[in-house]
A protein has these predicted regions:
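An N-terminal assembly and electron-transfer interface module characteristic of large anaerobic redox
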Residues: 7-9, 41, 45, 110, ...
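Structural motif corresponding to the early beta-alpha repeats
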Residues: 63-190, 194, 201-202, 253, ...
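Short, well-ordered beta-to-alpha junction loops that form the rim of enzyme active sites
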Residues: 137-142, 211-213, 325-326
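Histidine-acidic metal/acid-base catalytic patches
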Residues: 2-37, 47-52, 104-106, 118, ...
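Ligand-binding pocket scaffold of soluble enzyme catalytic domains
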Residues: 29-69, 74-76, 82-86, 90-95, ...
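A diffuse structural propensity rather than consistent per-protein peaks
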Residues: 44, 72, 181, 302-304
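Active-site-proximal beta-alpha loop/turn segments in soluble metabolic enzymes
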Residues: 169-185, 211-222, 256, 329-331
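Short connector loops/turns at beta-strand edges and beta->alpha or beta->beta junctions
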Residues: 56, 96-98, 212-214, 284-288
């Protein structure tokens, strides 16, 4: 189904307002300035044109996975060239550790995990050869967990998590990973980082790990999560001292750990930002906090997102700002185009504001 012309026209009208930030975005990696970027949005030609209309000039990409060898350099170079034909910089991708390499973290089995880590390291080398200098990944056992969607302004459908709505028998049910204690989880993370980060450092690729989403009580579905509080995040950074070891810093996932995210988010930004360990930012707001929240539009949630972006600027963060999850609505011709356009415009405006251009 094509996007109605009125919708295209509305987006085109906003293009001039985004152009100043867009021009700066294309040079941001050399002028030390934040820029809007997206990782979740699609990559068809039509979708890349939509990003152009929204003032987005940086995008992450996914690549075909080839059994036994991971990524193919030619695939990466072709996609990079295609992005550039739309005025987009392809400067980030995701290592599919959770999706493709179950023995590294999920099962923690040797010698299978050694073979998988070798392939992960080769994928890092391939990314570097293609000129991609940032990769995100995660070391979770449990995937993102949500309860029923909840309605927001104008009929937007937002994801939510309400622990008290999940029956205790569901919370106690083990995955096929079995019981994973905190000690077991840390051992698997340590094992991966010891082998992966030196390769990333050699090939100058920043590796940003994600926090666990959402925070859950110890033993939830048999797993003790270790990256859903401040102490766990600090411990993770200390495992490897390297300028290429850091965070995919998800403001929303961190807020999910907190009782008062409106105030408690700033020590996280100061601590990890001052240590230059924030490599990419997911700019997602929410209403609520630990064990009970609904995701929200950037100016609707509990956190003041101007202050959040200003805090990131003040610690010297200069990479991408990504809207992360966005809500959907029934009358959107593409289900999520309206919310992405809203978030891209908001981020571009906030970037202008924190640099004194508003």
């Amino acid at each position: 189904m094509s996007v109605p012309s009125q919708f295209d026209a509305g987006l085109a009208d906003g293009e001039a307002a985004a152009s100043a930030t867009g021009e700066a975005s294309q040079t941001s990696r050399t002028d030390g300035r934040m820029y809007v970027r997206t990782q979740s949005f699609g990559s068809t030609d039509a979708e890349l044109r939509f990003l152009q209309r929204c003032g987005v000039h940086h995008k992450a990409a996914s690549f075909p996975f080839h059994e036994g060898r991971g990524w193919d350099l030619d695939d990466l170079l072709r996609e990079k060239e295609r992005f550039e034909s739309f005025g987009l910089s392809l400067d980030m991708s995701a290592l599919p550790i959770y999706e493709r390499f179950p023995n590294i973290i999920y099962h923690g089995k040797s010698p299978e995990r050694d073979r998988e880590i070798d392939l992960v390291c080769e994928m890092i080398r391939t990314a570097s050869r293609a000129g991609i200098d940032s990769l995100r990944y995660n070391t979770c056992i449990l995937n993102i967990d949500r309860t029923e969607p909840e309605e927001g302004p104008g009929g937007f459908r937002h994801t939510a998590f309400r622990l008290d709505k999940i029956p205790q028998e569901e919370q106690d049910k083990l995955t096929d990973a079995g019981r994973v204690t905190a000690e077991m989880h840390w051992e698997r993370i340590d094992y991966l980082l010891e082998r992966m980060i030196p390769v990333a450092e050699e090939f100058k690729v920043r590796m940003g790990n994600s926090q666990e989403d959402p925070a859950t009580p110890p033993g939830y579905r048999g797993v003790d999560k270790v990256l859903n509080d401040f102490e766990g995040m600090k411990r993770f950074i200390e495992i490897q001292r390297s300028p290429y070891h850091g965070w995919n810093f998800c403001v929303g996932s961190i807020a999910e750990m907190l009782e008062d995210s409106a105030n408690e988010i700033y020590p996280f930004i100061e601590y990890f930002g001052s240590r230059n360990t924030i490599f990419l930012v997911h700019y997602r707001n929410l209403i609520g906090g630990r064990y009970s929240f609904r995701e929200a539009l950037p100016d609707e949630g509990d956190m003041d997102f101007y202050r959040v972006l200003k805090a990131l600027k003040d610690v010297g963060y200069c990479y991408g700002i990504d809207p992360d999850h966005v809500p959907s609505c029934e009358d959107d011709p593409k289900d999520y185009y309206q919310s992405y356009a809203y978030c891209f415009g908001y981020i571009n405006a906030m970037i202008q504001a924190v640099y004194g251009e508003a």
